[in-house]
Amino acid sequence: SCNAQNGNPNEGGIATDAAAETGTVQIGYAGSNWGAAAVYNYSNGVGPASGTPLAVLSGSGIDGAYFESVNSVGLSAYWQPSTSGWVPSISVGWGINSYNQGDTAFDYDGAASQSWYVGLQWDDAFIKGNALGMAVGQPTFITSCGDICKEFGKDGNTPYDAGYAWEWWYKFQVTDNISVTPAIFYLSNPL
């Protein structure tokens, strides 16, 4: 707990109404060449937001606009071909967060954010032991911002702050224990 050292149960402590806590439950399964997982997280006492400019604005502490709690769900999966070749291994993931606020001058409840990615990797690309890969996705971005967007003339349910992140890499297997992986990154909407 970030405020466990405060013994006043109205301001902190452990397992009190004012304590900040988090809990996570995850389940997963893996077969011989595939796997899938799901996760749920609840966090209380989240505090000020960080991230994209809109995320910071909607939970920045201005007028008491701190996020009080967040419920998060994530899903991920992967599949690998039984033999390497032209068919790549595939990894996918998606997550969503739903934010709730405490007492504030604005009603920002209803804020939500999401993220996703898709990754492809070709093993034994060009030379046995090397790998070529790419990934694309959107880092966490606001998909619904409740009343804070209405304050700025937005509809509150349109994705904002969305940008794409791309990565391309090639792994050179130098020895059995050493590999070198140069990569190129592209961000369509850097902070």
Predicted regions mapped to residue ranges:
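Aromatic- and glycine-enriched pocket-lining scaffold segments that form the walls
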Residues: S1-A30, Y164
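Transmembrane beta-strands of outer-membrane beta-barrel pores
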Residues: C2-N6, G31-N33, Y42-V46, W94-N100, ...
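Outer-membrane beta-barrel translocator domains and adjoining extracellular loop/strand segments
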Residues: C2-T16, G47-A65, N97-S113, T143-E151, ...
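Residues that define the transmembrane beta-barrel architecture of outer-membrane proteins
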Residues: A19-G23, S69-V73, G110-W116, A162-W166, ...
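Repeated loop/turn-to-beta-strand initiation elements of outer-membrane beta-barrel proteins
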Residues: G23, Y29, N33-A38, G45-V46, ...
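Residues on the lipid-exposed face of transmembrane beta-strands in outer-membrane beta-barrel proteins
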Residues: V25-Y29, L75-W79, V118-W122, W168-V174, ...
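C-terminal structural cap/anchor segments
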Residues: W94, S98-E151, P159-D161
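Extracellular low-complexity, Gly/Ser/Thr-rich intrinsically disordered linkers
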Residues: C145, G156-L191
